[in-house]
A protein has these predicted regions:
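Well-ordered secondary-structure scaffolds
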Residues: 2-289
Length: 289
């Protein structure tokens, strides 16, 4: 009986596996929704994830070994056997696989491009029976089977089976009336070191982090680190991990002016809406396979 159950579980995994490229906070919302709906999910990430909302990102499993977000646990895996074992345990394997070789080995039912790079990263409509992309950069019906809207507003989470998502405006969606003011960006390139923690209440003018320019980090020198300063009051909702190398003008953190600390440790409304769109797209497209 136990062997039969195991065989049934393995067959279900093989037939319904979803591969998600990316495991940042928005991708995590997608992964969480799919896992809760009963799909086995595997995610890929970079060796050094550049994730701002680390407390709600399965990408943290790359460095921590495992990461739990709202009852779903992701764990780093490095082989096909480990992936299958974790899936059989109801966990989400996270694999360092920037080249996407994993997808070709596992033959997933669906592939979700969730890096939100806002440009085509090489995913094609032929990579899986169902291919879905988040946000701009892909055309539904040509590059992928479906595109899910990621821009805050009336269409957030909408599924397009033809055409494109709304173009990238370069301006983040408004939260409590703030847009670009809530973002923390690196004024110069170098290594980032935080002075505050995710979940801290901050005020306008507070120093959130410093950038040590190349050649200065960790070495005695006369260089003065460049501060990153909060423009608005609120809760520090996200901040890159210490020691990461950043480029000038790169997003390194964000402040939530709603000042609700629990928002730092739960999946956002935006992530949930996008996750719902992906689930809808998969279930709809499965009917036409």
């Amino acid at each position: 009986m136990e062997q039969t159950r195991g065989e049934t579980r393995a067959r279900r995994i093989e037939q319904s596996l979803i591969a998600v490229k990316g495991a940042g906070d928005l991708a995590t919302g997608v992964i969480h929704r799919l896992a809760r709906a009963g799909f086995p999910v595997v995610a890929t990430e970079l060796p050094e994830p550049t994730v701002v909302r680390r407390t709600v990102s399965f990408a943290e499993a790359v460095l921590l070994g495992e990461m739990t977000v709202e009852g779903i646990t992701a764990q780093r895996a490095s082989s096909t056997q480990e992936i299958l074992e974790l899936l059989s345990q109801g966990r989400v394997p996270v694999v360092v696989d920037p080249e996407g070789r994993l997808f070709r080995r596992l033959h997933p039912l669906a592939l979700v491009e969730a890096t939100l790079s806002k440009q085509n990263t090489g995913i094609t409509i032929h990579d899986a029976p169902i291919v879905i992309a988040l946000g701009p950069g892909y055309e539904a019906g040509r590059d992928v089977h479906a595109v899910v809207e990621t821009n805050r507003g009336h269409n957030l989470g909408r599924v397009y089976y033809e055409g494109n998502a709304e173009p990238n405006t370069g301006i983040p969606g408004a939260i409590a009336g703030y847009t670009v003011e809530r973002l923390l960006k690196a004024p110069v390139g170098g290594k980032l070191y935080g002075t505050r923690q995710i979940g801290d209440m901050v005020q306008a003018g507070d120093i959130i982090a410093h950038i040590h320019e190349a050649g200065c980090a960790g070495e005695p020198c006369s260089c003065q680190p460049t501060p990153i300063v909060a423009a608005i009051p609120g809760i520090l909702r996200g901040l890159l991990r210490d020691g990461l190398t950043v480029k000038a003008d790169m997003k390194v953190g964000d402040i939530d002016p709603r000042a609700a600390r629990e928002h730092c440790f739960t999946i956002s409304d935006k992530s949930r809406a996008i996750g719902g769109g992906v689930l809808e797209a998969i279930l709809h497209l499965m009917q036409h396979l």
